[in-house]
Amino acid sequence: GHALAKGFALYDLGAYPGMVPGDGVVRGEVYEIPEGLLRELDWVEGAPFLFRRELIEVVLEDHTPLRAHAYLYNREVEGAALVPSGEWKV
């Protein structure tokens, strides 16, 4: 389902977004997956080099708090445009 991550900012890195710690709210989606898929997702996301996986607090649409894995951008965002809405549109 959909969720909000408070205390983060989303940047437009061109072909993809990058979430970093910040003063905003990032809107995204939460999926339940088998634990064994995390290594595969790490590879897809370029972790731990391009992105790093961290457990963060999110709030679901029904206001339920949840700890979820998120991929935070692991490089500088200087020069990248902030996505003010906090939501990446594909």
What are these regions (language model features)?
Residues G1-V90:
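Glycine-aromatic micro-motifs
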